[in-house]
């Protein structure tokens, strides 16, 4: 996986240099993989490695109303429909957005479906606070998912923040200004 992360890092950085006035180096440790597949089958490294340059060329930086639907469709495997959600709330007086996409279906062997979920926000929150909020909110939601008492070995959820909302800096996980965000994250 490190070789693929290195290739993605290199190609994304290269694309940014061509597309952006202020390109940033994208390091391989900033790339996260969510894997799904049949246990015991080899991961198709070469197929994925060969596909990366073309996939990165197709990246568009413009936002449109279909971007989250496209992202949800892009991670579907055995799902019958895309799974996405969006919430708006406030941190202090600043409006922030939370988007979530997921994949996963209620199936067990031989077609067990891995649940992968990704949450994105424009809230300006530290990694430490995001991790604490996520951990608190998955206890009775994501971590309570099972299918006939089984869970997949690769289930994962991750949260990402761009910080572009420019809300007031929050220093403590228990800050009351986070209550609306916390409630929205739990939906």
Can you say where each PLM-predicted feature lies in the sequence?
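Glycine-rich, mobile lid/loop segments that gate access to catalytic sites or pores
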Residues: 2-14, 24-142, 152
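Membrane-embedded hairpin module used as a gating/binding unit in multi-pass transport
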Residues: 137-144, 156-166
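A glycine- and small/hydrophobic-rich beta-loop-beta segment
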Residues: 162-187
């Amino acid at each position: 996986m490190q070789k693929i992360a290195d290739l993605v890092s290199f190609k994304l950085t290269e694309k940014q240099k061509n597309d952006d006035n202020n390109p940033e180096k994208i390091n391989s440790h900033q790339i996260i993989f969510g894997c799904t597949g049949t246990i015991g089958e080899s991961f198709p490294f070469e197929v994925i490695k060969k596909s990366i340059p073309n996939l990165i060329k197709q990246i568009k930086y413009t936002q449109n109303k279909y971007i989250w639907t496209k992202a949800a469709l892009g991670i579907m495997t055995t799902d019958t429909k895309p799974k996405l959600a969006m919430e708006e709330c406030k941190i202090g007086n600043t409006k922030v957005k939370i988007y979530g996409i997921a994949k996963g279906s209620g199936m067990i062997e031989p077609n067990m479906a891995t649940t992968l979920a990704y949450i994105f926000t424009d809230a300006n929150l530290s990694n430490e606070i995001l991790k604490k909020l996520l951990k608190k909110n998955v206890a009775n939601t994501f971590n309570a998912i099972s299918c006939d008492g089984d869970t997949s070995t690769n289930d994962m959820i991750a949260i990402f923040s761009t910080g572009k909302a420019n809300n007031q800096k929050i220093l403590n996980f228990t800050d009351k200004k986070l209550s609306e965000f916390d409630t929205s994250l739990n939906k």
